């Protein structure tokens, strides 16, 4: 895959980034170098290799899930101007 100036300008337009011609020319070379590196990475055989989430092994501490009401409903709505049965009351905005 190769990136040209028109592609750089189109991507810049979609990202709402102002790019002048000199910068677009420079970015073309940089993006082509990045894409070349990505193509090299795609050539590496990674069959049978587990994905790594951290460079050091870490066991996740697990706990049992418990369904609760949180026990702080009154505190959550304490500063609300209008509440009803521990729910926020807001003006109707859709008919």
Swiss-Prot record:
Name the Pfam families for this protein.
GatC
InterPro entries per the UniProt record, alphabetical: Asp/Glu-ADT_sf_sub_c, GatC
| Gene Ontology biological-process entries | glutaminyl-tRNAGln biosynthesis via transamidation; regulation of translational fidelity; translation
* Annotated keywords: ATP-binding, Ligase, Nucleotide-binding, Protein biosynthesis
* Keyword Ligase part of the UniProt annotation: yes
Respond yes or no to whether keyword Signal is given for this record: no
List the catalysed reactions: L-glutamyl-tRNA(Gln) + L-glutamine + ATP + H2O = L-glutaminyl-tRNA(Gln) + L-glutamate + ADP + phosphate + H(+); L-aspartyl-tRNA(Asn) + L-glutamine + ATP + H2O = L-asparaginyl-tRNA(Asn) + L-glutamate + ADP + phosphate + 2 H(+)
EC number of the protein = 6.3.5.-
Gene3D superfamilies referenced in this protein's UniProt entry, alphabetically: Glu-tRNAGln amidotransferase C subunit, N-terminal domain (1.10.20.60)
Superkingdom in the source lineage: Bacteria
User: One GO MF term, please?
Assistant: asparaginyl-tRNA synthase (glutamine-hydrolyzing) activity
Give the protein's function: Allows the formation of correctly charged Asn-tRNA(Asn) or Gln-tRNA(Gln) through the transamidation of misacylated Asp-tRNA(Asn) or Glu-tRNA(Gln) in organisms which lack either or both of asparaginyl-tRNA or glutaminyl-tRNA synthetases. The reaction takes place in the presence of glutamine and ATP through an activated phospho-Asp-tRNA(Asn) or phospho-Glu-tRNA(Gln).
The family classification in the record reads: Belongs to the GatC family.
> Quaternary arrangement and interactors, per the entry?
Heterotrimer of A, B and C subunits.
The protein's name: Aspartyl/glutamyl-tRNA(Asn/Gln) amidotransferase subunit C
Q: Which organism's genome codes for this protein?
A: Brucella anthropi (strain ATCC 49188 / DSM 6882 / CCUG 24695 / JCM 21032 / LMG 3331 / NBRC 15819 / NCTC 12168 / Alc 37) (Ochrobactrum anthropi)
């Amino acid at each position: 895959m190769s990136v040209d100036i028109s592609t750089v300008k189109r991507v810049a337009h979609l990202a709402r980034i102002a790019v002048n011609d000199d910068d677009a020319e420079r970015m073309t070379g940089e993006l082509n170098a990045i894409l070349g590196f990505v193509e090299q990475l795609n050539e590496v055989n990674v069959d049978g290799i587990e994905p790594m989430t951290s460079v050091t092994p870490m066991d996740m501490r697990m706990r049992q899930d418990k369904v609760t009401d949180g026990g702080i409903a009154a505190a959550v709505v304490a500063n609300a101007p209008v509440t009803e049965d521990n729910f926020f009351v807001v003006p109707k905005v859709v008919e």
